Amino acid sequence: MYVVCSDLESIYVPEIWISLAKKTGIAEFNITTREEPDYDKLMKRRIEILKENNIKLKNIQEVLAEESPFLGAKDFLGWLSSVARLIVVSDTFVEFANPWINKLGNPILFCNSLIIEKDGFIKEHVMRQDNGKKKVVDAIRSLNYKVIAYGDSYNDINMLMQADHGILYCPPDTVKEQFPQFPVAYNYNELKDIISKILN
């Protein structure tokens, strides 16, 4: 039996920080794990920028409430849930992701959390585990399941490598070129075809 592990942002929903960059005009928010593989370093800098610009958690949540999942995402997940079990494995934070997970039909989400100050500013981020995506795959495989994993960026690679089948979904050229061993899908139909071939 297969379990599917997938990333969240850039797969089913927009990148949270890119949405914030568009809303605030702060260009540095456009930097994601596609450009900066060190997620801890990236998040510490993001939190600094939020404080420098007087942006609180509620402001971020208001921006995200205006966003919708990508066209076709919910239908794709409906199909996927009929053929396998899905766990969304993301480096994002439950305080950001819950509204989107609701819009996607409430798949299981494994992610991280934030420490919020009394005045509403984000104090720091708390990673549930180091290298959490890989450890999720390890745990599932230890239960004698096979794993299909897909993601788009550097922080997904360990998860893809640890899975029985890894797939890149709409990756930047730099990631695709560095990891040519993974098949690439550029839309949900292509992803569905790759997964269907694995399952059959």
Which functions belong to the PLM regions below?
Residues 110, 182-191:
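Short acidic-hydrophobic, aromatic-tinged amphipathic segments that line or gate anion-handling sites
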Residues 2-113, 117-118:
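Alpha-helical substrate-recognition element adjacent to the catalytic core
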Residues 194-200:
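Short amphipathic alpha-helix with an adjacent loop that forms part of the alpha/beta core around
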Residues 94-98, 156-157, 192:
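Short, well-ordered alpha-helical microsegments
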Residues 95-147, 178:
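Substrate-recognition "cap/lid" segment bordering the active-site pocket of phosphatases
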Residues 86-91, 145-186:
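Acidic, Mg2+-coordinating phosphoryl-transfer loop and its flanking beta/alpha structural elements
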Residues 78, 138, 157-158:
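Alpha-helical segments flanking ligand/cofactor-binding loops in enzyme cores
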